[in-house]
């Protein structure tokens, strides 16, 4: 009975956010449809270009609902011990040979390690979760790169590549500009690592930012309630800053503000 009451409470907490996300997608689809109709009526050459993919689909609804469930049941809490999730180091040539790894870390090239292995006792660790098929995450990568360049002298940075947000065999997102990626749902760790490497080939991050992939059980994704994208700051093994659920509350500006308050403006 207690479990049923708990599930009901979680559902009631999720519903407002779920419906607001659905409303946003419905409005987005409507705007895109109107634009296409106007283009057709004006006989625009671009009217028939590209396939129109609706965002508000049954696959999309399931994905949105599951993302809210993941957020509701996340293990991570602000001010508490950071979950020490298993991750896999992504080999990326000179990136790893030129990266300074915190003393005492138990990190092996291409092998399984723990998220907190990348944290040093006196420096905060900025952890950015996302995937190549997540448009908001991709659009924020230049800002993340600037963060690394500005604060790598006082903080460490880690990019965790997770399950695809919009896989080609699932809830496909419309192409957003020239830097659009297409990956299917990862069938094995090799595919996930391959997707991570292709992302970094396109967005060259500074060598001070280390790159890992979530394990195939998605334990980091679950522990941190990521779903599609999330950012947090770990300091002395505790969560010093916990970003909101993406896409609407995923913000690197707040991370910059935290770092500036702690270490000064760059």
Swiss-Prot record:
Topology with respect to the bilayer: Single-pass type III membrane protein
EC number: 1.21.99.4
Transmembrane annotation, as ranges: 14-34
Signal sequence, renumbered to the chain: none
Active-site residues, record numbering mapped to chain: 134
Xref: Pfam families: T4_deiodinase (PF00837)
Cellular location(s): Endoplasmic reticulum membrane
Membrane-side (Cytoplasmic) residue stretches: 35-266
Superkingdom classification of source: Eukaryota
Enzymatic reactions: 3,3',5-triiodo-L-thyronine + iodide + A + H(+) = L-thyroxine + AH2; 3,3'-diiodo-L-thyronine + iodide + A + H(+) = 3,3',5'-triiodo-L-thyronine + AH2; 3'-iodo-L-thyronine + iodide + A + H(+) = 3',5'-diiodo-L-thyronine + AH2
Protein name (Swiss-Prot/TrEMBL): Type II iodothyronine deiodinase
Organism: Fundulus heteroclitus (Killifish)
Source species taxonomy: Eukaryota, Metazoa, Chordata, Craniata, Vertebrata
Designated gene of the protein: dio2
């Amino acid at each position: 009975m207690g479990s049923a009451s708990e599930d009901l409470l979680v559902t009631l907490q999720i519903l407002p956010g779920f419906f607001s996300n659905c409303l946003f997608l419905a409005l987005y689809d409507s705007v895109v449809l109107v634009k296409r109709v106007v283009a057709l009526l004006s006989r625009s050459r671009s009217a028939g270009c590209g396939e129109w993919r609706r965002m508000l689909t049954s696959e999309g609804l399931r994905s949105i609902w599951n993302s809210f469930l993941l957020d509701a049941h996340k293990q991570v809490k602000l001010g508490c011990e950071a979950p020490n999730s298993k991750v896999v180091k992504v080999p990326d040539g000179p990136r790893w040979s030129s990266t300074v790894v915190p003393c005492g870390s138990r990190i092996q090239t291409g092998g399984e390690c723990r998220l907190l292995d990348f944290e040093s006792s006196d420096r905060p660790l900025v952890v950015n979760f996302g995937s190549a098929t997540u448009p908001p995450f991709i659009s924020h990568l230049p800002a993340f790169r600037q963060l690394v360049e500005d604060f790598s002298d006082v903080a460490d940075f880690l990019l965790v590549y997770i399950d695809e947000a919009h896989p080609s065999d699932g809830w496909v997102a419309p192409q957003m500009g020239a830097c659009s990626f297409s990956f299917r749902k990862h069938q094995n760790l090799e595919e996930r690592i391959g997707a991570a490497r292709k992302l970094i080939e396109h967005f060259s991050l500074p060598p001070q930012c280390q790159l890992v992939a979530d394990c195939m059980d998605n334990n980091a994704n679950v522990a941190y309630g990521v779903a599609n994208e999330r950012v947090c700051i770990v300091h002395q093994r505790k969560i010093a800053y916990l970003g909101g659920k993406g896409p609407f509350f995923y913000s690197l500006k707040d991370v910059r503000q935290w770092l500036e308050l702690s270490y000064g403006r760059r």
